[in-house]
Amino acid sequence: MSIEVFNESGRGEVNEEELIDVARYALWTLDVHPAAELSIHIVDLETIEDLHVRWMDLPGPTDVMSFPMDELTPGWGRKDAAEPSPAMLGDIMLCPDFAEGQATRAGHSLAHELDLLTVHGVLHLLGFDHVTPEDEQKMFALQNEILANWYDSQEERGVSFAPKPTGAGAFPSAADRDDTQN
């Protein structure tokens, strides 16, 4: 799986290897073809606001945006699945300046917030959405399950990033989040 991170935000504290690992884990969990490609862009408030206005026709900045390229669905590893070809999933745009406020309000680190938003972005690239309350509940439940399992699997996989956060805001429901994620 090819995952590239482009830090265009000027924020040096963003752990690019951690974002790659959590994205790779999410894609693996969802049975995405191992040759799939993904780009993660770390951007500033001005850039994310411009994208948010231009592509979503919504004012102001946001935390994460996803731009899918090839249509791809989870499940390539199933025995009954057709053999897919490698695909370019698309781009995830993360804004640590915006995410930092959300992390503070939720009582956890910026790193955890960016991990959560990375999983959220991956799900959007794979066609998950939160337009209806039912879809929102399913998407956030899956997002939280993947993220919690990623934390739990670190030792087994021989990686060590941050410890699994605890507290009410660590793995939010859809109702706990601002309605600014896209």
UniProtKB/Swiss-Prot annotation:
Family stated for the protein in its record: Belongs to the endoribonuclease YbeY family.
Any GO BP annotation: rRNA processing
Record-listed Zn(2+) binding positions: 120, 124, 130
Cofactor(s) in the UniProt record: Zn(2+)
EC number: 3.1.-.-
Functional summary from the UniProt entry: Single strand-specific metallo-endoribonuclease involved in late-stage 70S ribosome quality control and in maturation of the 3' terminus of the 16S rRNA.
PROSITE patterns (UniProt xref): UPF0054 (PS01306)
Full protein name: Endoribonuclease YbeY
Entry-linked InterPro entries: MetalPrtase_cat_dom_sf_prd, YbeY, YbeY_CS
Organism, scientific name: Corynebacterium jeikeium (strain K411)
Keyword ATP-binding: no
Any single Pfam family the record assigns to this protein: YbeY
Keyword Cytoplasm: yes
Region (Disordered): 157-182
Compartment list: Cytoplasm
CC per GO annotation: cytoplasm
